[in-house]
Amino acid sequence: RRQRQMCIRDSSCPEEWIVCGNGAADLIYRLFQAEKPKKVLLTAPAFAEYEQAAGLVGSRIYFYELKEEDQFQIQEDILGQITPDTDLVFLCEPNNPTGQCTKHSLLTAILERCRECSALLVLDECFLEFLPDRKERTLLPYLGQYPNLVILRAFTKLYAMAGVRLGYCVCSDAKRKEQLMESGQPWGVSLLAQEAGVAALSEQAYADRVRKLVEQQR
């Protein structure tokens, strides 16, 4: 329970919405094992683990190409690629590896389109904490209204502790949360990772310095 309390501090979401994992990658694979989606929409390029996890459960993978002439940003034509036979849409905000963010209005339109098509939207926000306007960009406030939304978060990026492995996801759908928990080992987060996460949340001055440095060097 302590690890969930830690994630509550980070996300301001109810404890019953939170599932902790051995890093965000652990939760990505759990998601695909739990959902077993037949048709998945990913962006290209994107973090390779999305495609690998989808392939393990036999999903048909379709790609939305991020184009140089669009500064590698998602455009409104993605809405046409989300169809009633789409089971899962996986996006990364900001995208890995391009570093680009989707306009907030378009992101909420994608979320609504997914609901219309009974599709799950998985939003990887693991790099969002680097942004100065992260509070305006996150879709965490939409979780209560959209049970078809899952948000991934991790401590390992901003706090430079990737080897410790600590991540979590948030979802308001109780059944989906139970399926996620059942799709992985029950003791996936070590005591060391829990303690590191608690310590990280007290290091706000460090986090602010990292954000400032990243902004200066972009």
Give, region by region, the residue ranges found by the protein language model.
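Conserved beta-loop-alpha segment that forms the PLP phosphate-binding cup at the N-terminus of a helix
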Residues: 15-38, 167
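Short acidic capping loops at alpha-helix termini that bridge into adjacent secondary structure
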Residues: 14-18, 39, 125, 147-148
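PLP-dependent aminotransferase-like
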Residues: 26, 33-91
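Helix C-cap/helix->beta junction micro-motif
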Residues: 57, 116-117, 146
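Short, small-residue-biased leader/transition segments that mark boundaries at the very start
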Residues: 3-8
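Hydrophobic residues in well-ordered beta-strands that form the structural core
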Residues: 42, 63, 123, 151-153, ...
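PLP-dependent aminotransferase class I/II
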Residues: 148-218
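Active-site phosphate-binding strand-loop segment of PLP-dependent enzymes
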Residues: 69-131
